[in-house]
Each structure stands twice: as C-alpha cells, then as structure tokens.
A protein has these predicted regions:
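Hydrophobic "anchor" residues
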Residues: 26, 331-332
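N-terminal [4Fe-4S]-dependent radical SAM core
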Residues: 3-28, 49-88, 441
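Iron-sulfur (Fe-S) cluster-binding segments and ferredoxin-like electron-carrier domains
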Residues: 102-114, 339-342, 382-418
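Local cysteine-cluster metal-coordination motifs and their immediate loop/turn environment
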Residues: 94-104, 334, 372-391
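C-terminal accessory region of radical SAM enzymes
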Residues: 284-311, 337-386
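Conserved glycine-rich "GG(E/T)P / GGGxP" loop and the immediately following alpha-helix
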Residues: 88, 92, 105-272
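Short, small/polar residue-rich loop motifs at catalytic or cofactor-binding pockets
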Residues: 13, 317-321
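Short Fe-S-cluster ligation motifs
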Residues: 122-142, 402-441
C-alpha cells in the first residue's frame, strides 16, 4: 500500500480538512488530537484496522500497483468518448442588446430553412446510431430567443419526438439574456421539455440597465420577472443566474438584487459569478467569496467556486468527441468562447446531415489528453483541474496566449476551494438530513 499523490491537508480553525483529489472525498479531524495519527496512517500504511480501511475506501491510501496518472487518462478518454451527443446551435448572431464586453460580432440574419433541414437530418443520423443514448441540444447565439418560433421550437419539437421514437434520452437548454421569455413562450418551452437556462444579469438594477438595454429601454425588471415566471410555470427547472462582475460590481449590495427572487424558487437557481473577461487581470477574492456566501445563505442552490471541479475528467464540453457547435449558416465549430471567423472553423454540415470535419483538427484534439504534457502530469492539482481545454492549449502552442494553466489566472486558490467544498458537503448533508459522519465536523 502507498499514499495517494493527490492528498491535501488544509488547516481550518481547530481542525484539518483532509481531501483526496481523485475520490473527491473530504473529512476533517482535530488538529491537536487526531491529525498526526491520520497523517501517519496515510504516509506509512501498515496493518489493517478501521482507520486504514476508511482511508483505502476513500483513496487516501492506494494499492502499490495503482497508477493514478493512468487512472486519470483512462477516465479522461471515457468521458470524452461517452455515449451522449451534444449539439450547440446558434439560430442567429443577432442580439437585442449591445453589451460592451461581448466578443461576438452581431451578424444580421437567421438560420435558413435549408440549414434547419440539414440539422434535422443530423439529428436523425445521431439518434439512429446504436452507441448514442442521449442527445443534448443547447441554444446559443447571439440571442437565440429572437427566432424562437422560427428555429428553436420546431427543431426542438422534432428532436424530442424522434428521441422518444428511438428511445434516446433528450435534453434541451438555452443561454439567453432572458428579455424575450414571455408567458406564452414559457408554455411552449414546457412543450419541448426545456428545463435548464443560463441567464445573465450585470450587478444591480442601475448597473445592469446601463450595460444591457434595448436601444436605451431598461431590461432589468423584465428579466427578473421572466426568471420568476420560468421557475413558477416550469416545474423542476434549473437556472444558472450568471452575474458578470467587475471589482466595482462585487462591492455592490448583491443581496438587494438577489432578494427580488422569492424564497420558494431560490433552490432552483444557482448563482454563478463570472468575471468580465476584459478585467481578468484584476483580483478581489474577498468580495467574491463574500457574495458567494451571501447567495448560499439566502437559500440559492449550492455552487462551488473557482476553476476546479470534482469527478470531471475533461475541462470543457467542447473537448468531447460527440460534440458540434453549429452556426446559423451551417458552418461547424468547437469552441463557444471564440468568434466565428474562418480560423476557428472545424467543418461544415452537408445536406444529408453529415458533418464534414477538418480531419487535421480532430486528429490534434483526440490523439491524446489535453493534460498529457509535462506541466500538467507533474501537478498535484491535476484531478481537480484536468488541464487546459483544447482551444486554450492550441492558442498557447500557436503563440496567441502566454499561458495555458488555469491556476495562473484563478481568482480562488486551491486551499480556499477545498475548504468551501468541505463546507458545501456538510451543508448538503444537513439539508438532506443524511446521517453525517462525525468526521465532517
């Protein structure tokens, strides 16, 4: 037996939090009375008793024969080549707002009937494949709701029906500014089984209306009311309420904004703070954490902070083999965080609903794991970071980025992440009234 390379021990008040990056298991022990014993068990695993059994079960101690890097590589390949197919579709690149930080160019025009037919043929092809058991369609843009009736509704309805016919699980979701989500459209969203939304606000009402307006017409109240309507009329909906922030926005009274959402729907809303990318060089972790805590204390769904994750073996959904991002003109991309210039094109959709991929790009993407480089393989954070996404690593290799390591730009350090993960696990166990191990205290 040997100690895992991915054990972390973080002092917290009068205790030490013990965390393993591969298993995601976390517990705490008394700093004064128990930690030295636990550490000795882990560092020199001799004999068999209840303590060593617990540590082995939770991967703090592993078999001599276990290669943790191979375990991570194997699970990375499994997650990238799994049996779900994810389509991200842009009905348009038009938008009813003009946010100053948006990286997209508002090209006029919507998806044509011809391209819609190609997409329906693609969906037929995907759902008839024996190895595909789930289809996920994410609507993106531009503002996708500009062409809800013309594009989103008919394609989603088609996909829902053909998935039911072929016994394929179907999910659809949308990233939207939320302004056009009328009561009538919410009813139509129920019909196509859309239950997940990402909707953005920019700080408080005053700041938001300066950034997000329709030719000067304020949008804040309309968006908040639409979010409340979605939670009211679509049972079990899940909303990611993205708050784009700068240091100035973090200092606002975010609680006043969040209090606009009734208590009974807050469990369906996860508040996700994301820094405006033009201010990525700035830092204010203290205010960021204060606001994350505030959202949690107000009853919103739990959210982890930082760029780290548990049991996620690839960085981005776009790194998966069964993924395609289809623009309104039928051209195919991978990354949803870049523009739609020729440089980022990865293929094109044929009349028969087949994606003609750029084979060179696919070979580069899938020949090995993105973290299969010296820096990542030697890093203790690998299981909870899983390296760069393909696009960031490509930009770095082509000299268009100075770094590919997320840790170098992470506003929340790893110790803080682990402490907060531990506290989140405790809170969830209490809310579910699970039997809580004394080790969580």
């Amino acid at each position: 037996m040997k100690s895992s390379k991915y054990n972390f021990f973080i002092p917290y008040k009068d205790r030490v939090i013990c965390f393993n990056g591969i298993s995601g298991k976390v517990f705490s022990v008394s700093k004064e009375h128990e930690f030295d014993d636990i550490k000795q068990y882990i560092e020199t695993p001799i004999g068999k008793n209840n303590v060593t059994d617990f540590l082995v079960q939770n991967k703090f101690i592993i078999e001599d024969s276990m290669d943790e890097l191979e375990f991570l590589k194997t699970n990375n390949r499994r997650s990238i080549f799994d049996n779900s197919y994810h389509l991200v579709i842009n009905p348009t690149l038009e938008c009813n707002f003009k946010c100053w930080y948006c990286y997209e160019k508002a090209v006029v025009g919507r998806m044509s009937d011809r391209t819609m037919k190609k997409i329906k043929n693609l969906i037929k092809n995907i759902t008839s494949e024996e190895n595909i058991d789930e289809l996920i369609i994410s609507w993106f843009g531009g503002e996708p709701m500009l062409y809800f009736c013309q594009v989103i509704y008919p394609i989603s309805l088609f996909a829902r029906n053909i998935c039911e016919k072929n016994n394929v699980k179907f999910e659809t979701n949308m990233t939207t500014n939320g302004f056009l989500l009328s009561r009538e459209r919410i009813q139509m969203l129920r019909e196509i089984k859309m239950m997940r939304f990402q909707i953005t606000i920019d700080g408080n009402k005053k700041t938001h209306n300066k950034v997000r307006n329709q030719n000067g017409k304020p949008s804040f109240d309309e968006i908040v009311n639409n979010i409340i309507s979605i939670c009211t009329y679509i049972p079990n909906t899940h909303i990611t309420l993205r708050i784009n922030y700068t240091n100035e926005i973090l200092k606002q009274d975010i609680g006043e904004t969040l209090s606009l959402f009734p208590k009974q729907i807050r469990k369906n809303i996860r508040v996700d703070f994301q820094r405006v990318w033009q201010t990525e060089g700035e830092r204010n972790a203290v205010e960021l954490l204060r606001n994350i805590d505030l959202a949690s204390d107000m009853g919103f769904a739990p959210a982890l902070c930082g760029e780290y994750s548990i049991h996620k073996y690839h960085r981005c959904y776009a790194d998966r083999f069964n993924f395609a991002h289809i623009n309104f003109d039928g051209k195919v991309y991978r990354c949803t965080a870049r523009d739609y210039s020729q440089r980022y094109e990865c293929g094109e959709l044929s009349e028969a609903g087949e994606i003609i991929w750029n084979t060179k790009i696919n070979e580069l993407m899938f020949s090995k794991s993105n973290f299969d480089n010296e820096k990542c393989l030697s890093c203790k954070l690998l299981p909870i970071c899983v390296g760069p996404c393909y696009q960031n690593y490509r930009d770095y290799k082509e000299g268009k980025s100075s770094a590919f390591c997320f840790e170098e730009n992470n506003e929340i350090d790893v110790n803080t992440f682990i402490v907060r993960y531990y506290l989140t696990v405790k809170k969830i166990c209490r809310e579910r009234q699970d039997a809580i191990s004394p080790l969580l205290y």
